[in-house]
Amino acid sequence: MAERKYFGTDGVRGKVGQFPITPDFALKLGWAAGKILATQGTKQVLIGKDTRISGYMLESALEAGLAAAGLSAAFVGPMPTPAVAYLTRTFRAEAGIVISASHNPYYDNGIKFFSANGEKLPDEVEEAIEALLDQPMDYVESDQLGKAIRINDAAGRYIEFCKGTFPADASLKGYKIVVDCAHGATYHIAPNVMRELGAEVIEIGTHPNGLNINDKCGATDISALQQAVLTSKADLGVAYDGDGDRIIMVDHLGNKVDGDQILFIIAREALRSGKLKGGVVGTLMSNMGLEIALKHLAIPFTRANVGDRYVLEQLKEKNWKLGGENSGHIIVLDKNTTGDGIIASLEVLAAMEAHKMSLNDLTHAVPLFPQVLLNVRFDGGNNPLENAAVKALAKDIETRLVGKGRILLRKSGTEPLIRVMVECEDAVLAQQYAEEIVSAIQNH
């Protein structure tokens, strides 16, 4: 794969008003994508966004670029990333575009693409788009210019799709659920899905103003959700991030239920119902408690690099259907082509309803190991992880932790940091081992 100039692992992303998140670059990107994506099909591209104020500016610029290349744009407005993937497929569009920076603050934004089948664009297509970005723009003839339409019922279509993944003979009647939408793209979707399935819903994070997305709310800050669950005596709480591809849950006692626990609940229920295909893909950061719990059920487990795109790659390689990260990206390929927070929450709720068990009860089978995470800064130059003393200590600790913990040492790809992670049944021991490793790295 050629080295990328503009596209990162998740499209183009950055601070609004600074290259490449500017209207002039977005226009050029729309044009370049339009030139590459134009085929003999519908010549239509679906455009969705989250609730950032900059989304208005960027979608207009993208639409102008697409039109100049002869492609029409179909706007769906604020819409979760997985919804855009789904709607791109059902509208038979050439591609889907999402304007979002996921869990980042409002002053960041990004642009990423889905192929016609709702999956990440192939590398060769992204490379072809990049090559055009450095070329002067040309335009189709006036009678070939693209148009723009707005799809007013997109939210309703996705709500019905989500509800259709929930067992037809089940209901959420009797459940009180607090739903935190991070003032993001799920604000008009998730509460309605839960209500229409019968739940009593208490909303927080559902009043976006363009500036408050992910601000002290959502999957990256669940303190408000925990308080709301306890205050309202709810059965559980659900938090999504700004673009709806990540989920964290809270049980009735206010305890956090992370992506590893959610993944286990879904996997166990799929096994019970005979719908589990293959095994489960986690990441290098997945808790050892998840691995052990899956092993007790004889469910195969493998680890991908950190990042939902790497989880997806492993799933496709193994032809498995279920994977995710402890941060809350949960991919259920039987239901959607990308991580989908609403679908994941419905999978957990279906398991609760099937067994008439609380979320707290369902998490008991996957006791998470205490995990210590430390960052150590170093002065460029030699990689401390190649130092003989550091390697010897790491090997010694790994030997001591066999069967009851693990360590993970990795160099940051963006800054001069070594990330140290130690998991152990004994929290005190985990902290001790982590500090020993940090000391060795600092003294290398």
Swiss-Prot record:
UniProt xrefs under PANTHER family = PHOSPHOGLUCOMUTASE (ALPHA-D-GLUCOSE-1,6-BISPHOSPHATE-DEPENDENT), PHOSPHOHEXOSE MUTASE
- Sorted alphabetically, which PROSITE patterns does this protein's record hold? PGM_PMM (PS00710)
Record field: catalytic activity? alpha-D-glucosamine 1-phosphate = D-glucosamine 6-phosphate
Q: Encoded by which gene?
A: glmM
Mention any Pfam family matching this sequence: PGM_PMM_IV
For this protein, the record's NCBIfam families field holds:
glmM, PRK10887.1
Q: Which residues carry this modification: Phosphoserine?
A: 102
The record's section on InterPro entries has: A-D-PHexomutase_a/b/a-I, A-D-PHexomutase_a/b/a-I/II/III, A-D-PHexomutase_a/b/a-II, A-D-PHexomutase_a/b/a-III, A-D-PHexomutase_C, A-D-PHexomutase_C_sf, A-D-PHexomutase_CS, Alpha-D-phosphohexomutase_SF
Quote the protein name from its UniProt record: Phosphoglucosamine mutase
Q: Which domain of life is it from?
A: Bacteria
Record lineage: Bacteria, Pseudomonadati, Pseudomonadota, Gammaproteobacteria, Pasteurellales
Query: One GO cellular component from the entry?
Result: cytosol
Question: Which note does the record give on the cofactor?
Answer: Binds 1 Mg(2+) ion per subunit.
In its UniProt entry, the species of origin is given as Haemophilus ducreyi (strain 35000HP / ATCC 700724)
Q: Name one GO biological process term.
A: peptidoglycan biosynthetic process
Q: What does this protein do?
A: Catalyzes the conversion of glucosamine-6-phosphate to glucosamine-1-phosphate.
